[in-house]
């Protein structure tokens, strides 16, 4: 259970960064070779700094109007963890508001720097 708590701590720090603009320690949440991909596995960010910057950019430039999560699942095996969830969000940027929903799949690994996100896949459900 202590292992699961350590994984959840990293997930909570990442969540606090984009939702509460609490960026302290965000970079440490990502492995140096972390990758974020989207639909069709298009690469959005690669490397610790770029992944952290993507969260800072969204938190700084988008106003989240509504957000909810469901279907949480966390599985931990020795030094690997997979966390998945579904989400719905409405947010505002300069171009206007946008409503999206989808799922996230996060893979974390336990290394010399503790638990870190190594891979994130973001799926956006097709617009209805």
Predicted regions and their residues:
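Short, cysteine-centered beta-strand-loop-beta hairpins and adjacent loop/turn segments enriched
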Residues: 89-99
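Short, well-ordered beta-strand segments in beta-rich or mixed alpha/beta enzyme
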Residues: 14, 36, 81-91
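Short helix-adjacent coil turns
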Residues: 14, 20-22
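Short beta-strand segments enriched in hydrophobic/aromatic residues
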Residues: 30, 87-89, 121-124
């Amino acid at each position: 259970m202590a292992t699961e708590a350590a994984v959840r701590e990293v997930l909570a720090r990442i969540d606090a960064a984009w939702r509460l603009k609490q960026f302290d320690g965000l970079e440490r949440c990502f492995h140096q070779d972390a990758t974020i991909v989207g639909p069709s596995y298009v690469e959005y960010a690669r490397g610790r700094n770029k992944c952290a910057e993507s969260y800072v950019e969204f938190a700084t430039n988008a106003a989240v109007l509504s957000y909810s999560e469901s279907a949480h699942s966390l599985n931990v095996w020795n030094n690997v963890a997979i966390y998945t969830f579904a989400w719905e969000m409405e947010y505002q940027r300069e171009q206007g508001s946008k409503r999206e929903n989808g799922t996230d799949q996060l893979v974390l690994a336990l290394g010399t720097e503790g638990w870190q996100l190594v891979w994130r896949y973001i799926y956006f459900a097709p617009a209805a």
